[in-house]
Amino acid sequence: MPNYIDLWNNIKNSFEKDDSMSKASFGAWVETAEPISLENHIMKIKVLSSLHRDYWTKHLIEKFVEYAYQFTDQDITPEFVTEDEFKTQQAERSATSKKETKASTEDTQLNSRYTFDTFVIGSGNQMAHAAAMAVSDEPGVLYNPLFFYGGVGLGKTHLMHAIGHQLLENDPKTRVKYVTSEAFTNDFINSIQKNKTEEFHEKYRNVDLLLVDDVQFFADKEATQEEFFHTFEALYNAQKQIVLTSDRLPNEIPKLQERLVSRFKWGLSIDITPPNLETRIAILREKAQADNVEIPDETLEYIANRIDSNIRELEGAMARIQAYAKLQNAAITTDLASDALRSLNFGSNLSHITIPMIQDKVAKYFHVTVADLKGKKRMKSIVIPRQIAMYLSRELTESSLPKIGTEFGGKDHTTVIHSFDKIKAELEKDEELARQVGDLKSELKP
């Protein structure tokens, strides 16, 4: 059987060739009609008014059935709907679809602000964004699991939610579940205490998309890891999409079961690095437009230069500046932004950062000791962390070069300068190093 449009065109041509139908009648009744669908041998046809429907019913149905049979060898029955009725049906369907989507979104705990439309793409997240889009188009096929890793406030959660929203937009019936690793753990514990493990399994294994945030917190939780392993297996074997986030690669998560590490690496792991200056400016501009606030480009650049750690701090700074402008009843300028960040103590947490704090964070991050950082060992696994610690000490504290050298076991100030310059230069071309430094800055400037 031809598709309904081809069939309609053939039927319409037959009416046009019918000697018993005048051109005026053809133009008034047939030409103005429009096919909508063909299901179960019923062709739904849209007509201009109830008058047109009555005319078709009284004068044209028999010939329609005859012409349709000529082309299909089947009995096709027309069903007419007026223009107004069609619009009403469309509006009702649209409202129902939106209602279903809203209900689905509420059930999934997705944040309505975190969509692909509101995500600002930059060099540090370009690949992650592309992978997220690909997974949205073909869930469970290309990259499963999809594993985002990087420091806090860089957009991992945003992309995760965007995937969920996109799948629901594609099909409102998609079963999406977003959960933090902590919430998953709590649900699991509660299910055991209340003897509701079957309900727990139904909740997490009967979905099309599972989004789990901050899986590094599964570390040290043996029973939870065991449960998540079986949840992962059930979804993966059913070709359901899994998306995970962490602050580090799977194999860098301490005390994570080897079989989970292995499965987390089955798909695609992508790091998200701190945004560069251009991306930070774009993020601020996007937020200003969303908030309908006018901010000069030079002011946006000033803010972007002040905050270089993560998106969360950028948005926090923007919120502070807008609030300050309202209090002052003044337009936002660079001077006002400077006053706002100073008067609201933005960035004052830097004054609390000390060299010992930096040494402690760096040592834990790279799994070395503070003594190693202060010592003279020349292994690469120690030299790089030592140079990063010196770089951060100069970047995040007001300490003099000699003071920094003293804190690192009596190093000469030229050694500190060399370390700072080396790391600064490498940051421009080494994405992994940029991610590591960004992670440490985020931890030091919560």
From Swiss-Prot:
Residues 1-74 are annotated as: Domain I, interacts with DnaA modulators. Residues 95-105 have a biased composition (Basic and acidic residues). Residues 109-325 are annotated as: Domain III, AAA+ region. Residues 88-107 are annotated as: Disordered. One of its GO terms (molecular function) is ATP hydrolysis activity. Residues 326-446 are annotated as: Domain IV, binds dsDNA. GO terms for cellular component: cytoplasm; plasma membrane. HAMAP family: DnaA_bact (MF_00377). NCBIfam families: DnaA (TIGR00362). Belongs to the DnaA family. This is Chromosomal replication initiator protein DnaA.
